[in-house]
């Protein structure tokens, strides 16, 4: 009886399909000193083939726009995006979606208090391909000087 139960458990383990965790975006972080207490924080998204990530300026009513919140210091000006921006009208949402494929570099000026040696924050983003969209995801980051 024990052998039968053991065999059933092992069989179920190998037969039950394992859920595949999709993670089509990886982030790299860097910082460039621009002044005594002024830094340029770079959050670079590397996007897998056939996937795209939405712009920080993606319109309301569409997919989740990328948001980057900085916990340390004070942001100076608006976040900039460096990459090949694409715009497509999505009839499901009724808006022009703005997104990037392959890669995008989000750049934000941050003024830090004297002695602060790190920039931390959270990225909220959503990715889609031609068949599916993944739910919005939060990623915490820490950039050391």
Q: Predicted regions: what is each one?
A:
Residues 4-16:
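Sec-dependent N-terminal signal peptides
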């Amino acid at each position: 009886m024990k052998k039968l139960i053991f065999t059933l458990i092992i069989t179920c383990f190998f037969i039950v399909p394992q859920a595949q965790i999709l993670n089509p975006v990886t982030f790299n972080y860097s910082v460039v000193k621009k002044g005594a207490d002024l830094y340029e924080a770079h959050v670079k998204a590397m996007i897998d083939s056939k996937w795209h990530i939405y712009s920080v300026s993606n319109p309301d009513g569409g997919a989740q726009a990328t948001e980057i919140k900085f916990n340390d210091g004070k942001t100076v000006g608006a976040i900039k995006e460096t990459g090949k921006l694409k715009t497509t009208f999505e009839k499901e949402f009724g808006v022009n979606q703005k997104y990037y494929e392959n890669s995008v570099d989000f750049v934000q000026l941050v003024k830090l208090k004297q002695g602060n040696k790190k920039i931390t924050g959270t990225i909220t983003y959503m990715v889609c391909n031609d068949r599916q969209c993944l739910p919005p995801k939060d990623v915490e980051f820490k950039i050391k000087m």
